[in-house]
């Protein structure tokens, strides 16, 4: 197996979970940016949320243009951090279904590994209810594909996934989180314009489609934009409070230093 383990930063993991919980009707996807060390351990530092051109309940696809754009973003991060950043994997959600990859997922993963043997796949299973406690659960897994011994098909191999705690939210992950509402809005606009451009629709149908479009945007504002804004405001308040505490500590230390002098 090419990869021994995967370490994902806590703030990047948070963006993946938030993106996965943004919709329970279709699967969502994104790309992982990071580096691979000499011990064949993949370190994921940030993620890129991808815009879906075709919404499907049980399938996601990454276009060559999106992969190229992600590579460009990885190069930009490499210049900023001075580390060899690249696209090291992909993630997608499994709403209401098992966390294990489907045959399509395994074949897709095998295709990516043909380009990079260190490429990994992450799956987030969400909107799953525990039958005993009646509480929601989020399950996640990391995998690669290998050729089956007595078959031409591929099979999955689970890769250990470790979430690395991170006390702060780095700028690159914060930008990805803030980008989520805009991407979801663009997806709704694309779907509405595609349907609205059909010439055979009557006036009542167009009015209905417009109402559905407005309803979906309001739902996104309530479920995504509102909580995200509240979270950012709470985070800002915490940072300001912490800054005041550090300033007070600094002044106290300066006074003690002055007394010693």
UniProtKB/Swiss-Prot annotation:
Which GO biological-process labels does this protein carry?
cell division; DNA repair-dependent chromatin remodeling; double-strand break repair; mitotic G2 DNA damage checkpoint signaling; positive regulation of DNA repair; positive regulation of NLRP3 inflammasome complex assembly; protein K63-linked deubiquitination; proteolysis
Q: Where is the MPN domain?
A: 6-149
List the cofactors. Answer: Zn(2+)
PROSITE patterns, A to Z: MPN
- Domain of life where this protein originates: Eukaryota
UniProt remark on cofactor binding = Binds 1 zinc ion per subunit.
Q: Which residues bind Zn(2+)?
A: 92, 94, 105
| Presence of the UniProt keyword Mitochondrion in the record | no
- Coiled coil ranges (UniProt) are none
Q: Which Pfam families match?
A: BRCC36_C, JAB
User: Which intervals of this chain are the motif JAMM motif?
Assistant: 92-105
E.C. numbers: 3.4.19.-
Q: Does the keyword Isomerase apply?
A: no
- Keywords for this protein: Cell cycle, Cell division, Chromatin regulator, Cytoplasm, Cytoskeleton, DNA damage, DNA repair, Hydrolase, Metal-binding, Metalloprotease, Mitosis, Nucleus, Protease, Ubl conjugation pathway, Zinc
Q: Which GO terms describe its cellular component?
A: BRCA1-A complex; BRISC complex; cytoplasm; nucleus; spindle pole
GO: which molecular function terms?
cysteine-type deubiquitinase activity; metal ion binding; metal-dependent deubiquitinase activity; metallopeptidase activity; polyubiquitin modification-dependent protein binding
- State what this protein does: Metalloprotease that specifically cleaves 'Lys-63'-linked polyubiquitin chains. Does not have activity toward 'Lys-48'-linked polyubiquitin chains. Component of the BRCA1-A complex, a complex that specifically recognizes 'Lys-63'-linked ubiquitinated histones H2A and H2AX at DNA lesions sites, leading to target the brca1-bard1 heterodimer to sites of DNA damage at double-strand breaks (DSBs). In the BRCA1-A complex, it specifically removes 'Lys-63'-linked ubiquitin on histones H2A and H2AX, antagonizing the rnf8-dependent ubiquitination at double-strand breaks (DSBs).
Q: Describe its partners and assembly state.
A: Component of the BRCA1-A complex, at least composed of brca1, bard1, uimc1/rap80, abraxas1, brcc3/brcc36, babam2 and babam1/nba1. In the BRCA1-A complex, interacts directly with abraxas1 and babam2. Component of the BRISC complex, at least composed of abraxas2, brcc3/brcc36, babam2 and babam1/nba1. Within the complex, interacts directly with abraxas2. Both the BRCA1-A complex and the BRISC complex bind polyubiquitin.
Similarity field: Belongs to the peptidase M67A family. BRCC36 subfamily.
Write down what this protein is called.
Lys-63-specific deubiquitinase BRCC36
Q: Which organism is it from?
A: Xenopus tropicalis (Western clawed frog)
List the gene name.
Answer: brcc3
């Amino acid at each position: 197996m090419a990869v021994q383990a995967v370490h994902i930063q806590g703030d990047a993991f948070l963006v993946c979970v938030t993106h996965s919980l943004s919709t329970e009707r279709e699967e969502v996807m994104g790309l992982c940016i990071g580096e691979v060390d000499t011990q064949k351990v993949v370190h994921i530092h940030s993620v890129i949320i991808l815009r879906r051109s075709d919404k499907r309940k049980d399938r996601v696809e990454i276009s060559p243009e999106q992969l190229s754009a992600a590579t460009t973003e990885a190069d930009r991060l490499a210049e900023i951090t001075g580390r060899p950043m690249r696209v090291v994997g992909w993630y997608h959600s499994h709403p209401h279904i098992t966390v294990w990859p489907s045959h399509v997922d395994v074949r897709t993963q095998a295709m990516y590994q043909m380009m990079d043997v260190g490429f990994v796949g992450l799956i987030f299973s969400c909107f799953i209810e525990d039958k005993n406690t009646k509480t929601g659960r989020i399950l996640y897994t990391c995998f690669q594909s290998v050729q089956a011994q007595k078959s031409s098909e591929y099979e999955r191999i689970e890769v250990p996934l470790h979430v690395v705690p991170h006390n702060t939210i780095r700028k690159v992950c914060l930008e990805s989180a803030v980008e989520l509402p805009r991407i979801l809005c663009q997806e709704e606009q694309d779907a509405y314009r595609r349907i609205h451009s059909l010439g055979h629709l009557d006036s009542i149908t167009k009015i209905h489609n417009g109402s559905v479009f407005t309803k979906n945007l309001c739902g996104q504002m309530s479920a995504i934009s509102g909580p995200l804004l509240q979270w950012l405001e709470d985070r800002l308040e915490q940072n300001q409070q912490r800054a005041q505490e550090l300033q007070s500590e600094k002044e106290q230390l300066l006074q003690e230093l002055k007394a010693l002098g």
